Amino acid sequence: MNEKYEAVIGLEIHVQMDTKTKMFCGCKVEFGAEPNTNVCPVCLGMPGALPIVNKRAVEYAIRASLALNCEVHEESVFARKHYFYPDLPKGYQISQYEKPLATNGWVELNLPNGEKKKVRIRRLHIEEDAGKNIHEGDKTLVDLNRAGTPLMEIVTEPDIRTPEEARLFLEKLRNIMRYAGVSKADMEKGQLRCDINVSIRPKGSKEFGTRVEIKNVNSFRFVQKALEYEIERQINVVEEGGEVVQETRTFDPQTGKTYPMRTKEEAEDYRYFPDPDLVPLKVKKEWIEEIKKNMPELPDQRFERLIKEYGLSEYEAGILVNHKEVGDFFEEAVRHFKEPKGIVNWLINDLLGLLRDKGISIEESPVKPEHLAELVKLIKEKVISTKIGKEVIKEMVETGKTPSQIVEEKGLKQITDENQIKELVKKIFEKHPKEVERLKQGEEKLIGFFVGQVMRETRGKANPQVVNKVIRELVKEV
């Protein structure tokens, strides 16, 4: 990026709440159902059908607001946002405008240079989702299963300055939503969607440049790529003496470029007004306090606790926290065998890589937490060596068998019997008299040679420490 300029970035994120039913009716929320099967007169916008607020969705929105350090208002108002689109059967969307549920929050980011940065949250409000248009050839099909699904719209202040910060913010937000238990926040399933507002200005300037919106970018990587391209594009326009046009653009992952869509609507275009079918949403202070009291552990709290409770490094704790299910797997394994350092090493350095190679998520892992704990125990108690452990964990991923089963079936138990190892070392000494002589003369590196010979003979099953000790003792006797 040109050093003369800085980017000013704000994000609008739609998060689908993980409720069983829709925002204003009793229809099921279900990903991948047959088109137009989860619909009723309310979400189809039939005349005379009246909305009823989903209490669980309001609870989730309050929980999310608290997790984002927002101030939750005791009164908020549902408003109609009017626009015409085939997937919006009522001709308006029920949202919140002048009086949102929550305002004035913040999220703290850990930047790669070690600094911390606060991104302020302007507002969080509740709304319903639209349906989905599916384009097939020259036809457009409309699926209204998604219409009426509960959403939260989270709007940041324009505090973000780089494409990387935008990606880090979204990753952190997804994590907070998952930890708070309000959304799976899976971008691939459309449970988290992001619109980007970006402008540029000369470094040090307090004025805002002309804002461009990039719509519906559907992965964190693409958010970063779209911003990198768009910032560069705006700088080039200004450098060549032109003016950035206020517009809505779309990002094409194939080309890595943004393209114009339509002129950006102003809020007036939506003709917001309070929804006459819904009374203002009043939330009692006691209910907010009760939700606050029962808040689950959030990512930053877990990060601190993992370091304190288990003695993990920041790097290890970071990996476990950034993938909630991986953190849950680790803690479950430690419950079965209290060896956190060993478990985290095998989890991060071995198991996750093996699962990634097979395209399996930790939730679908054939290796259960108690089995990873058992493997670490077998190594700790010197039943098998670390080297054999590597083979065993591969087999565990392939077959789903327990480590004990594999060790038993394949006869992989470590040989720790000194007499058995002594006999072996004597035979190897007989085969390599010259090397024995050199070792006696003090050529220490030959210890490694003899350990290697024993390991080869036992197919890696001899305990290397015992082998080392026996070699040192026997060489004195020769």
Swiss-Prot record:
Protein name, UniProt field: Aspartyl/glutamyl-tRNA(Asn/Gln) amidotransferase subunit B
Molecular function terms, GO-annotated: asparaginyl-tRNA synthase (glutamine-hydrolyzing) activity; ATP binding; glutaminyl-tRNA synthase (glutamine-hydrolyzing) activity
UniProt xrefs under InterPro entries: Asn/Gln-tRNA_amidoTrfase_suB/E, Asn/Gln-tRNA_Trfase_suB/E_cat, Asn/Gln_amidotransferase, Asn/Gln_tRNA_amidoTrase-B-like, GatB, GatB_C_1, GatB_Yqey_C_2, Gln-tRNA_amidoTrfase_suB_CS
HAMAP family: GatB
This protein's record includes keyword Kinase: no
Keyword Disulfide bond assigned: no
Catalytic reactions of this protein: L-glutamyl-tRNA(Gln) + L-glutamine + ATP + H2O = L-glutaminyl-tRNA(Gln) + L-glutamate + ADP + phosphate + H(+); L-aspartyl-tRNA(Asn) + L-glutamine + ATP + H2O = L-asparaginyl-tRNA(Asn) + L-glutamate + ADP + phosphate + 2 H(+)
Entry function: Allows the formation of correctly charged Asn-tRNA(Asn) or Gln-tRNA(Gln) through the transamidation of misacylated Asp-tRNA(Asn) or Glu-tRNA(Gln) in organisms which lack either or both of asparaginyl-tRNA or glutaminyl-tRNA synthetases. The reaction takes place in the presence of glutamine and ATP through an activated phospho-Asp-tRNA(Asn) or phospho-Glu-tRNA(Gln).
Source organism, top-level taxon: Bacteria
Naturally occurring in which organism (per UniProt): Aquifex aeolicus (strain VF5)
